[in-house]
Amino acid sequence: MDLKVTTLAGKDAGKVEVSDEIFGLDPREDILHRVVRWQLAKRQQGTHKAKGRAEIARTGAKMYRQKGTGRARHSSARAPQFRGGGKAHGPVPHSHAHDLPKKVRALGLKHALSAKAKSANLIIVDDLAIKEAKTKALVESFAKLGVTNALMIGGAEIDAGFKRAAANIPNIDVLPIQGINVYDILRRGTLVLSKAAVEALEERFK
């Protein structure tokens, strides 16, 4: 399939041929859901912690004698039922990450790209580079493209001026091709790819 290429100024820059196996699939929500869950689970810190009864700074001596008081039988005041006692089965630091096959991850990226192409929320630009690192000029360029909420993917190296100018624009993310991922694609309304990014994706999934 052929996709239209434009410049940052909104002018026509020809067309680029892309693979239907990358940009022309029927998006599957189950695949996208699995990949997003896998990504977000990996990001969780898992540092939550509550002290158990063995970790509470309190005497371990028996509270009072076993018999003769008329009260319930108790031993340590560290027990979970007491105020200030340890937490029963409380959270401990652990990783929330789970495995996901590489083929499913790759398929998820293809389906995310196809979803943007199918919904007409994919823009191909000739290059993510500007002469002057001015945020105002970049905002004007985005207005011509109709971009207000977007993920922008460039080649292996992002133009320093473009990256600096885009840093202060809300709802705009800029990543090199190595950082492309399903979650960031889906969380933004529009996906903007440079020609270098398209070529890298074609090479990656060849």
From Swiss-Prot:
Region Disordered, residue ranges: 63-98
Pfam families (alphabetical): Ribosomal_L4
Coiled coil segments of this chain: none
A GO CC term assigned to this protein in UniProt: ribonucleoprotein complex
N-terminal signal peptide: none
Basic residues bias spans: 64-76
GO molecular function: rRNA binding; structural constituent of ribosome
Keywords tagged on the record: Ribonucleoprotein, Ribosomal protein, RNA-binding, rRNA-binding
UniProt-listed GO biological process terms: translation
Subunit relationships: Part of the 50S ribosomal subunit.
Family according to the record: Belongs to the universal ribosomal protein uL4 family.
Record's function text: One of the primary rRNA binding proteins, this protein initially binds near the 5'-end of the 23S rRNA. It is important during the early stages of 50S assembly. It makes multiple contacts with different domains of the 23S rRNA in the assembled 50S subunit and ribosome. Forms part of the polypeptide exit tunnel.
Protein's UniProt name: Large ribosomal subunit protein uL4
Native source organism of the sequence: Chelativorans sp. (strain BNC1)
